[in-house]
């Protein structure tokens, strides 16, 4: 084969890989550009019922929306992520997926120990929202703790996909191509931190936020408190197409 044919073939392969990266960006942008519902009560969904009464379809759909939001933020604000989109997609993705060799992953401490628990809690709240029998408020009942345990398990599954799946940091940005950027910290801290943060947010919402709301009818104050003290639930609400400060049965105007 002559050099011109070889060169043309190489350029064609690179263009295909770049097209794949471009498609991923387009999907992410389209997802984020969908307007959030203006009402505080979400539209009814179609339930795929299990013995526990969980809307599996809704859980997957809203988790995909959360995934697209997170990847859109990465693409928008991380130059290193955008730079890796132009490489050989499948080859780099395959080389990026491997078992971690160390605990750390070169991320700042606040990313691993604050950011990852929040993103895990958001995934966990999506599960809770679609598990119809899950208590909405913290309590000492076994039903409450079992529901939060299942939410943490879903957060672990979501985190695994976020790290290694077809729509992951490994495929979008090639995190892990450098072995130093792949650590056990994400796989442990995300689900464990999600469980702790969900319980903490539930406690803060019931015993502090709700108490303050009982002493003021200012909607701005009420919304602000919910956003500040419940970051995981805020992100979950946004991904589910609800107002960030949404609470079931507790609109901002409650008395």
Please annotate each region the language model reported:
Residues 12, 21-22, 38:
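Residue-identity detector for glycine
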Residues 1-17:
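N-terminal secretory signal peptides that target proteins for export/translocation
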Residues 40-255:
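Hydrophobic alpha-helical membrane segments
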Residues 15, 24-25:
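Polar low-complexity intrinsically disordered regions enriched in Ser/Thr and small residues
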Residues 7, 28-30:
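Short stretches within intrinsically disordered, low-complexity N-terminal or propeptide regions
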Residues 25-26, 36:
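Cleavable N-terminal signal peptides
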Residues 18, 36-43:
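Generic low-complexity segments that are intrinsically disordered, proline-rich and/or Lys/Arg-biased
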């Amino acid at each position: 084969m002559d050099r011109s044919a070889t060169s043309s073939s190489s350029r064609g392969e690179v263009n295909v890989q770049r097209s794949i990266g471009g498609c991923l960006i387009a999907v992410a942008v389209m997802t984020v550009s969908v307007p959030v519902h203006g009402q505080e009560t979400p539209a009814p969904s179609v339930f795929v019922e299990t013995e526990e009464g969980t809307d599996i379809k809704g859980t997957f759909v809203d988790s995909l929306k959360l995934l697209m939001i997170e990847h859109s933020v990465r693409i928008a604000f991380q130059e290193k992520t955008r730079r890796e989109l132009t490489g050989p997609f499948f080859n780099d993705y395959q080389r990026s997926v491997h078992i971690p060799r160390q605990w750390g992953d070169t991320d700042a401490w606040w990313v691993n120990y604050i950011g990852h628990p929040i993103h895990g809690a958001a995934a966990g709240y999506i599960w809770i929202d679609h598990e119809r029998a899950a208590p909405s408020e913290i309590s000492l009942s076994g039903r409450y703790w079992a529901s939060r345990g299942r939410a943490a398990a879903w957060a672990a599954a979501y985190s695994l996909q976020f790290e290694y799946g077809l729509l992951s940091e490994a495929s979008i940005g090639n995190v892990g191509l450098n072995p130093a950027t792949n650590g056990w910290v994400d796989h442990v801290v995300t689900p464990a931190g999600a469980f702790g943060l969900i319980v903490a947010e539930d406690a803060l919402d019931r015993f502090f936020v709700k108490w303050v709301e009982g002493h003021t009818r200012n909607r701005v104050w009420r919304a602000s408190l919910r956003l500040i003290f419940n970051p995981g639930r805020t992100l979950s609400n946004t991904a589910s197409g609800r107002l960030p400060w949404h609470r079931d049965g507790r609109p901002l105007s409650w008395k």
